[in-house]
């Protein structure tokens, strides 16, 4: 897998060798390794930029704290230590991909992206392992291929907050002191047994929940793991009368004084990353954007971009779509400054940077700017309706699009883009609208312990919208995967 000797002349957006052969597999491995490398480079730069002191103490605090939604690792640890956590988790994922000798696919890329995405708010190098071990044992005992279930192993890390709570708080006390974390043998046993058990349940749930939403929620693991999380939370906490932890808060006045978080650093980092993706895709696509126009015509339903267009075109899509996300975030963050009646939201926090990666998860498997736009429009429509009602009732507007819950919700609601692609922009807007209504309420169902809450929300939205479309015989406008 030598980047310097990987000949872009052998790559074509419509070349079967790219689509199905080793080249696409290699390009996924190369690009994910480059993302991991970018985290390693950003870590010391982040320490310098934020004047972060006690780097190792900050990293230790990230690794040993309960991490339910939404735990901002920039606040809990620091800018550099958070990037380093993402780097070592990303490297671990790279090593699993390489050692398993799996032929990397779009789902493998998605699994990697969701791992590194949540390393900024809830997933760390400690709590990622038990469920991966569980899936590995599931494959060994049931004689299934781990290579074919690699993406499920990576998806299962969404249950990481349960692992951290069981290990560091659940068996000790109702409260948690981030400055003095404790661990017990019983807690470790709980965490390991839970991870192993989850490894046997998640692979069994995924096919059934996918059938429920018929593939209209790209974050299909979100619905499966969200439902599982409800049962776990209800039994382990509600039924047993054990209090769930609060979101870990720590005194960090320098960070909280930043109006827009680490806006400058994160913008520069993402601009470099997205530019690199576009250039890399352009070069490996025979110095052209050939195929990207056709990708943008896709309905985003039942189409594997990697298989149809090649990874080089998917890299171009990654970069272009990423710039669209970045433009949206920079816009909504300044809206409260322009319109004084809007409540101030957040900025480029750890969760915000994390969901940028989460929103790009399926950029090789269905997500693209054209079909995403109606989903974004749906969020804007709900906000406009709320502002209108509040104006008529003469009450304060309670939230803005820059609130963390709505930023996170929208990132995962983009997984509903198949609705706009298949049924048209109006249905896509409705899907975004419905998802926005519930996006800040669903985490209470599982106690905030499921990191893929946005995918869970999108899944519930699909479960409501699909039977309505069926009942009123709303016909898909576009049957083919391109139009």
Regions flagged by a language model, labelled:
Residues 2-123, 277-288, 310-315, 323-329, ...:
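N-terminal signal-anchor module of multipass membrane proteins
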Residues 104-106, 288-390:
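Transmembrane helical segments that form the transport core of multi-pass membrane transport proteins
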Residues 75-87, 119-129, 183-197, 267-271, ...:
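Structural signature of hydrophobic alpha-helical transmembrane segments
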Residues 191-209, 220, 402-476:
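C-terminal transmembrane helix pair
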Residues 282-293, 468-482:
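Membrane-interface capping segments at transmembrane-helix boundaries
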Residues 98-99, 116-124, 135-149, 153, ...:
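Hydrophobic alpha-helical bundle architecture
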Residues 92, 107-118, 129-139, 152-157, ...:
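Short, structured motif recognition centered on aromatic/hydrophobic residues
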Residues 18-26, 144, 160-267, 442-457:
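Membrane-interface helix-loop-helix junctions at boundaries between adjacent transmembrane segments
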């Amino acid at each position: 897998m030598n980047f310097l000797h990987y000949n872009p002349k052998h790559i074509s957006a419509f070349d079967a060798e790219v689509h199905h052969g080793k080249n696409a597999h290699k390009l996924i491995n190369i690009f994910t390794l480059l993302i991991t490398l970018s985290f390693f480079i950003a870590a010391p730069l982040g320490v310098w930029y934020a004047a972060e002191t006690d780097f190792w103490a900050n990293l230790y605090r990230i690794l040993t704290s309960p991490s339910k939604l939404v735990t901002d690792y920039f606040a809990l640890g620091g800018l550099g230590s958070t990037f380093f956590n993402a780097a070592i988790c990303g490297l671990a994922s790279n090593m699993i991909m390489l050692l398993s000798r799996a032929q990397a696919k779009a789902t493998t890329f998605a699994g990697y992206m969701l791992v590194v995405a949540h390393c900024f708010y809830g997933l760390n190098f400690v709590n990622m392992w038990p469920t991966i071990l569980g899936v590995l044992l599931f494959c060994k005992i049931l004689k299934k291929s781990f290579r074919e279930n690699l993406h499920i192993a990576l998806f299962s890390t969404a249950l990481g907050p349960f692992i951290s709570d069981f290990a560091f708080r659940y068996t000790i006390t109702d409260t948690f002191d981030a400055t003095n974390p404790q661990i017990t043998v019983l807690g470790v046993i709980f965490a390991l047994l839970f991870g192993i058990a989850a490894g046997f349940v998640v692979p069994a749930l995924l096919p059934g929940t996918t059938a429920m939403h018929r593939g209209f929620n790209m974050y299909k693991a979100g619905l499966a793991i969200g439902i599982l999380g409800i049962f776990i939370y209800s039994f382990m906490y509600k039924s047993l009368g054990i209090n769930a932890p609060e979101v870990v808060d720590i005194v960090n006045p320098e960070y909280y004084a930043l109006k827009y978080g680490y806006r400058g650093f994160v913008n520069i980092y993402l601009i470099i990353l997205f530019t690199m993706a576009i250039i890399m895709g352009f070069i490996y696509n025979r110095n052209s954007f050939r195929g990207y126009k056709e990708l943008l015509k896709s309905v985003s339903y039942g189409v594997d971009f990697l298989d149809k267009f090649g990874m080089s075109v998917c890299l171009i899509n990654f970069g272009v779509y990423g710039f669209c996300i970045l433009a949206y975030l920079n816009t909504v963050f300044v809206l409260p400054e322009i319109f004084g009646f809007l409540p101030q939201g957040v900025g480029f926090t750890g969760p915000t940077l994390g969901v940028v990666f989460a929103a790009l998860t399926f950029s090789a498997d269905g997500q693209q700017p054209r079909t995403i736009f109606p989903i974004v429009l749906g969020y804007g429509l709900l906000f406009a309706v709320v502002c209108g009602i509040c104006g008529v009732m003469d009450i304060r507007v309670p939230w803005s699009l820059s609130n963390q819950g709505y930023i996170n919700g929208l990132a995962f609601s983009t997984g509903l883009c198949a609705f706009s692609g298949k049924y048209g922009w109006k249905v896509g807007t409705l899907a975004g609208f419905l998802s926005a209504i519930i996006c800040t309420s669903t985490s209470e169902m599982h106690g905030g312990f499921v990191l893929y809450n946005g995918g869970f929300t999108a899944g519930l939205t699909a479960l409501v919208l699909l039977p309505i479309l069926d009942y009123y015989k709303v016909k898909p406008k576009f049957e083919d995967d391109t139009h």
